[in-house]
């Protein structure tokens, strides 16, 4: 049934829709059989279709259209015959993905009058290959040729098993019918090749569209080019089908030193150099009312001369206008789609490229450009040209008509008769269109667990008296200059001498930086880095608790990489492996050794450091495995005289490390054992270490080891919101870090122990809320629970043990008891809550917190109240008043 009106078009779409639904279920084997049969039929009809196209359109050359038809069938088939376009395209068992191809549906094919049969063949074949249907809207000037090409492909496809209405066309095309087709609700994609107006209409249709832009291909010929090849290539390309290929050359820009030679070569090989009035006459005929004159499109050179009012020999290949103006006022500077060519002189290569840039920007942006140079010996020019030209195809030493369509002069450039021009040309793609653009890809993504790790320092020395033995490794490794980073107390009390005396005796030069204070600041760190830069150590030894070790780690980074910006080091990340800022490679200038003199921080084995910006008071927890020391020395002799308060705060810091590591979303079977063992040691030995001190060296040593073991656990499993809030409390109110954790940990457990939290932290291996169960496991491991206890009872016993332990170690019952004034706390609690939410530790917490929830935990901990799920501060404050009112009423 012929399609001559909208009703007939709607009927056609319905038939094609039915056919495509059937075709969508075909296998790859069936599709490939149809694809091959259709390509064979199109190739076989290449000559009659070419003759029909020239006769009907009055454009082009039969012999060249034969080549285009052959290309559209043979080259397209050869390029895509083995491409998978049906069903499962790929499977990746390692990453658990399956990619599945689905057809788009019905495609509207817009076909130009310049390439009426080859474009129809091309679009039909790639539609068949992808299980799509296609309906053509041909150009009125070449409708019969286009529709005949489509019919030949269709009949061959039907004979090979395709549904009968898989390809359709409009018999009497009009603007009305083209618009109706493009806007039809059952059209799924528009594949538009044609003039700017039609392509713009396609993109304005509200449907997905793949269109092409105008071409205005400039050619640059430099002084190193093979002139004979360059001229021959341009002539071959420009005369191909009388220049109707949109990629064909429109201008040549020749470097001055070879301009005359190029000009002469053109003149002696079929190029006609327009002179005087002839040039003006052709300029006048190229454009009509400011647009390309359709009368010259696809016409031979001698006919264009006749239109301009003069004659040239019939064997003239192209008309060449030597011009100087590079803007829209010059007709030769436009796309001409005919054997007419502008020729410009450039003073040098850079000037030639600049002119080419202007020509592209004027009318062919995104399409094609060409350079003739010595490509083997001028890679810099090839690169320069490639970077300067805003075109999707940048051809080197290649005839543009044949080269742009791909697979003829470069065999990785995809063959196509629809050439995308990217966003420059107002297109959705910037490559040669092929089957991949006509399929929808579905990705089946199976749940996969994150790759985890267990990273430690290369060496960990422990037991009493291990310090001098460990330092022997520093000596035998050949280190010559050691910088010791510590605090003034440890320096004044001879702790640093225990290191320097051993090293100096072995001939190692030493320098001591002892200005680190509690909560190290950026200014102190920078001062230490300056000393490192002047002393140039090959080993840095951090001696002390968390503060000297944290400071030393940042000094190490600044010494190794002085170009580093602290703001980038402090940037938060969701996944340490995917962070935006990558820490630089460490250990090039110096090795890092951490000697811990407190039992709690764990910093000697962790990739973490905390530093305070003294300009703002903000604490920044930094994290990266580049910060992990190369060696940790855990010598309990260094903590025998540790004061009771430091023992208590450090011990409870270690308890919190182990607790948070065990319930973290990154917890693993590797970190679990260390977290549990650390808690077991701390439960057994922390009270004795606190009360008896150096009189019980075994207890001191076990707590010292437990702190490092907990450090290993949280170095790999990370921490949670207890530390997030503790960091901010310490920064704002100068509460010792271990004390802040001790104050918060019980309410954090109450908060996390919820199997139905407001939000669960998103991490692949953490598939459901587990904190409640894991807290109960801790109670079991510590021997706190009794047979038959339910989970809730186990957690209550865990909390009771912690409260008892804190009381025994002299920990205040609330933040208020720790000395923070109520007005000061309430004035800052909102900011504390938001800053804690933004802390790096928050992301590993098993429960993803709301800022309001963190605020509630902080308020409850300030007043010494138990956190209760769903109870806000307002409710808690109202409850006593309500009870008092009720009591009065009863009385």
Curated annotation (Swiss-Prot):
Q: Which SUPFAM superfamilies match?
A: ALDH-like, Dehydroquinate synthase-like
Which positions bind NAD(+) 2?
487, 519, 546-550, 610, 619
Q: Which cofactor does it need?
A: Fe(2+)
One Pfam family it belongs to? Aldedh
Query: From what superkingdom does this record's organism come?
Result: Bacteria
Q: What class of enzyme is it?
A: oxidoreductase
Region Alcohol dehydrogenase, residue ranges: 449-891
- Residues binding NAD(+) 1, per UniProt: 110-115, 195, 213, 335, 419
Listed under GO biological process in this entry are: carbon utilization; ethanol biosynthetic process; mixed acid fermentation; protein homooligomerization; response to oxidative stress
Give the protein's function.
Under fermentative conditions, catalyzes the sequential NADH-dependent reduction of acetyl-CoA to acetaldehyde and then to ethanol. Under aerobic conditions, despite the reversibility of the two NADH-coupled reactions, wild-type E.coli cannot grow on ethanol as the sole carbon and energy source due to the down-regulation of adhE transcription and the inactivation of the enzyme by metal-catalyzed oxidation (MCO). Nevertheless, in the presence of oxygen, AdhE may act as a hydrogen peroxide scavenger and have a protective role against oxidative stress.
Outline the subunit composition: Forms long filaments, called spirosomes. Forms rod-like ultrastructures composed of 20-60 identical subunits. Two monomers form a dimer in a head-to-head arm-crossing fashion through the ALDH domains. Subsequently, two dimers form one helical pitch via the interaction of ADH domains in a tail-to-tail manner. These units are further assembled into spirosomes. Formation of these spirosomes is required for activity. Can be isolated in vitro in a wide range of oligomeric states.
Q: Quote the record's miscellaneous comment.
A: Has previously been proposed to have pyruvate formate-lyase (PFL) deactivase activity and to catalyze the quenching of the PFL radical in an Fe(2+), NAD and CoA dependent reaction. However, it was shown later that AdhE does not catalyze the deactivation of active PFL. Inactivation of PFL is attributed to the CoA and Fe(II) present, which appear to increase the rate of deactivation.
Q: What is this protein called?
A: Bifunctional aldehyde-alcohol dehydrogenase AdhE
Q: Which organism is it from?
A: Escherichia coli (strain K12)
């Amino acid at each position: 049934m012929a399609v001559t009106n909208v009703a007939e078009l709607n009927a056609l779409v319905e038939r094609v829709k039915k056919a495509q639904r059937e075709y969508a279920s075909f296998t790859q084997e069936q599709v490939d059989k149809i694809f091959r049969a259709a390509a064979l039929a199109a190739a076989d009809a290449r000559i009659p279709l070419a003759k029909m196209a020239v006769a009907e359109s009055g454009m082009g050359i039969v012999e060249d259209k034969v080549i285009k038809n052959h290309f559209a069938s043979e080259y397209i088939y050869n390029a895509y015959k083995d491409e998978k376009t049906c069903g499962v395209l790929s499977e990746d068992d390692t990453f658990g993905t399956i990619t599945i191809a689905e057809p788009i549906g019905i495609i509207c094919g817009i076909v130009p009058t310049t390439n009426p049969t080859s474009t129809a063949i091309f679009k039909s074949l790639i539609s068949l290959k992808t299980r799509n249907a296609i309906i053509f809207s041909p150009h009125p000037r070449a409708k019969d040729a286009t529709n005949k090409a489509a019919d030949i492909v269709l009949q061959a496809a039907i004979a090979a098993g395709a549904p009968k209405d898989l390809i359709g066309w409009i018999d009497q095309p009009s603007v009305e019918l083209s618009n109706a087709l493009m806007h039809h609700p059952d059209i799924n994609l528009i594949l538009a090749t044609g003039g700017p107006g039609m392509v713009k209409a396609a993109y304005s249709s509200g449907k997905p569209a793949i269109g092409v832009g105008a071409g205005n291909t400039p050619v640059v010929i430099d002084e190193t080019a093979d002139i004979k090849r360059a001229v021959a290539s341009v002539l071959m390309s420009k005369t191909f089908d009388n220049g109707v290929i949109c990629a064909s050359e429109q201008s040549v820009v020749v470097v001055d030193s070879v301009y005359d030679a190029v000009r002469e070569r053109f003149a002696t090989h079929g190029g006609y150099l327009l002179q005087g009035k002839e040039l003006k006459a052709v300029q006048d005929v190229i454009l009509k009312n400011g647009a390309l004159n359709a009368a010259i499109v696809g016409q031979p050179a001698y006919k264009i001369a006749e239109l301009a009012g003069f004659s040239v020999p019939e064997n003239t290949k192209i008309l060449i206008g030597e011009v100087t103006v590079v803007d829209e006022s010059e007709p030769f500077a436009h796309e001409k789609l005919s054997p007419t060519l502008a020729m410009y002189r450039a003073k040098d290569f850079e000037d030639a490229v600049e002119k080419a840039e202007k020509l592209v920007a004027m009318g062919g942006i995104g399409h094609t450009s060409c350079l003739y140079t010595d490509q083997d010996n001028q890679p810099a020019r090839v690169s320069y040209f490639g970077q300067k030209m805003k075109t999707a195809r940048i051809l080197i030493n290649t005839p543009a008509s044949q080269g742009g369509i791909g697979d003829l002069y470069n065999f990785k450039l995809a063959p196509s008769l629809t050439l995308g021009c990217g966003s420059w040309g107002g297109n959705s793609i910037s490559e040669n269109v092929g089957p991949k653009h006509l399929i929808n890809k579905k990705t089946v993504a199976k749940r996969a667990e994150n790759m985890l790790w267990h990273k430690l320092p290369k060496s960990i020395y422990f037991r009493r008296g291990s310090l001098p033995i460990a330092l022997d490794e520093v000596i035998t490794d050949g280190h010559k200059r050691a910088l010791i980073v510590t605090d003034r107390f440890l320096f004044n009390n001879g702790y640093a001498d225990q290191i320097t005396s051993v090293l100096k005796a072995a001939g190692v030069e030493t320098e001591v930086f002892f200005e680190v204070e509690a909560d190290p600041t950026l200014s102190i760190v920078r001062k230490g880095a300056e000393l490192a830069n002047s002393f140039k150590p090959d080993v840095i030894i951090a001696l002390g608790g968390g503060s000297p070790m944290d400071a030393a780690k940042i000094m190490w980074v600044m010494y190794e990489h002085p170009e580093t910006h602290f703001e980038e080091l402090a940037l938060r990340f969701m996944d340490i492996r995917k962070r935006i800022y990558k820490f630089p490679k460490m250990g090039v200038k110096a090795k890092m050794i951490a000697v811990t003199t407190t039992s709690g921080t764990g910093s000697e084995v962790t990739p973490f450091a905390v530093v305070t910006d003294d300009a703002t008071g903000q604490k920044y927890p930094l994290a990266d495995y580049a910060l992990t020391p190369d060696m940790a020395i855990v010598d309990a002799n260094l903590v025998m005289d540790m004061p009771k308060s430091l023992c208590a705060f450090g011990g409870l810091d270690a308890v919190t490390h182990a607790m948070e590591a065990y319930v973290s979303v990154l917890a693993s079977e590797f970190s679990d054992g260390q977290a549990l063992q650390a808690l077991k040691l701390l439960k057994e030995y922390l009270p004795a270490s606190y009360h008896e001190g150096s009189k019980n060296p075994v207890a001191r040593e076990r707590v010292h080891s437990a702190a490092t073991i907990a450090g290993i656990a949280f170095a790999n499993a990370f921490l949670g919101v207890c530390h997030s809030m503790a960091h901010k409390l310490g920064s704002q109110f100068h509460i010792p870090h271990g004390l802040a954790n001790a104050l918060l940990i019980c309410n954090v457990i109450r908060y996390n122990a919820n199997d139905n939290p407001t939000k669960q932290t998103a991490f692949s291996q953490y598939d459901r809320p587990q904190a409640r169960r894991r807290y109960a496991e801790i109670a079991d491991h510590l021997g706190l629970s009794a047979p038959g206890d339910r989970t809730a009872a186990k957690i209550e016993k865990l909390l009771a043990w912690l409260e008892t332990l804190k009381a025994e170690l002299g920990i205040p019952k609330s933040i208020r008891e720790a000395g923070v004034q109520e007005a000061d706390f309430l004035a800052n609690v909102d900011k504390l809550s938001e800053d804690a939410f933004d802390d790096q530790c928050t992301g590993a917490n098993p429960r993803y917190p709301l800022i309001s929830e963190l605020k509630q935990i902080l308020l409850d901990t300030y007043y010494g109240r138990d956190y209760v799920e769903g109870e806000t501060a307002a409710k808690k404050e109202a409850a006593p008043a309500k009870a008092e009112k009720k009591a009065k009423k009863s009385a």
